[in-house]
Amino acid sequence: MADSTADESTNADTLWRELHKVLPEIWYDGGGKDHCEIDEAIRILTCLRKIESKNPESDISPVEVPKEFICTLSNKIMIEPMLIASGQTFEKSYILEWLKHERTCPRTKQVLYHRFMIPNHLINEVIKEWCLIHNFDRPKTSDEVIDLFTGDLESLLQRISSPSSVEDQTEAAKELALKAKRFSSVCVYFVAKIPDSITRLLTPLSISEDSNPEFLENIVTALHIFSTSEKNKTLVAENPLVLPLLAKYMKQGTVLTRIHSAATVNSLSYTDSNKIIIGNSEVLKALIHVIEEGDSLATSEAFSALSNLCPVKEISEKAVSEGLIRAAIKKIKAGSNVSMLLSLLAFVSTQNHQTTEEMDNLGLIYDLFSILRNSNSLVNDENAVVIVYNICKSYKALQNVVLREEKRDVVLEEENKHGTFTRLENQEAGRATSLAKRILEWILR
């Protein structure tokens, strides 16, 4: 009896060695090129099942899952093996998530000529046989969200917050920004699942002298991308490091740093609960600085942020007191970002009529006349005439009769020389036509 058991043990060892020779051939040929190898694997597994059934005590020892049964994406035994164009097999839910973002095979790195996949029934049968022999409880399919690209986020953050060298820190920041840009799951996971992730990400910026522009660009870029996820907006805005650093880097740093800093504020400003937080911070003044001094892209982001914030009257009043009107008019006079800034000034002048005095003192009305004479945009026409109308309302309210008549004459002269408001009245272009008519009624009375 002892000899028989020993023989069976020897046979089992031999069979396992044979199986481990066959499995790689099946896997790396895609599991479907040679059915003889599949049949051989099933034959070996059937023999093993017979041997194991005579030695139930062997089931007690722990079982190591063959690496060929493990999906390289999930690092778990496959439940629904799927064959892709490269001939490689992966767990269904993981390869589906991978192919949402990638056009390459995770194992071979070759570019896939299509993203179709089919169930690998042959490999599935081999795994089922193995599980039966070892009484291995194969997991059921799950609706669990796949965090496929998040495995190295903690190590990247560690390299950023506790760097071994400046070069490695910069490279880690670059990798993090690229990951965040490519995979939406990374954005949510980084902020929600990694403890103190935003603080750890930004701490190097709060203690450094900004001597590494590339590192700074990548960190601010990553922060911008994290802020675009709806789930992250409040958590990011409420972090005490975020807004002071964004305010700082809207005023200094590279062009890209300024653009991404303004874009981050813009992204955060879409959430109502963030508006008061932003309005009460130094970010508001920094946005106005970007409007006045920034390039076109940064100005566009700052404009969008202010458009989100200024409907809150307290924030609008603060923005005006911080120099919004002067900054916007400076850009309009320079011919930069005219359309968006006209839109902003039209809103502000309607919301707060006291702003029209500053607009008038800065000579904006002459720029508006020029825009109305030369514009091919109905939107610009409407916004420009809204501002002119609001300025005229402030003229009409003047107590000094002489000054009031002088101001009226300025508008009348424009009409007499160029017929600006008559042309607008005849356009039948909605609000612009209506306001032009009112202006004409006042100046031609």
From Swiss-Prot:
GO terms for molecular function: ubiquitin-protein transferase activity. It catalyses: S-ubiquitinyl-[E2 ubiquitin-conjugating enzyme]-L-cysteine + [acceptor protein]-L-lysine = [E2 ubiquitin-conjugating enzyme]-L-cysteine + N(6)-ubiquitinyl-[acceptor protein]-L-lysine. It is an enzyme of class 2 (transferase). Its EC number is 2.3.2.27. It holds the Pfam family U-box. Residues 64-137 form the U-box domain. One of its GO terms (biological process) is protein ubiquitination. Pathway: Protein modification; protein ubiquitination. Keywords: Transferase, Ubl conjugation pathway. InterPro entries: ARM-like (IPR011989), ARM-type_fold (IPR016024), RING-Ubox_PUB (IPR045210), Ubox_domain (IPR003613), Znf_RING/FYVE/PHD (IPR013083). PANTHER family: U BOX DOMAIN-CONTAINING (PTHR23315), U-BOX DOMAIN-CONTAINING PROTEIN 46-RELATED (PTHR23315:SF265). Functions as an E3 ubiquitin ligase. This is Putative U-box domain-containing protein 47. It comes from Arabidopsis thaliana. The gene is PUB47.
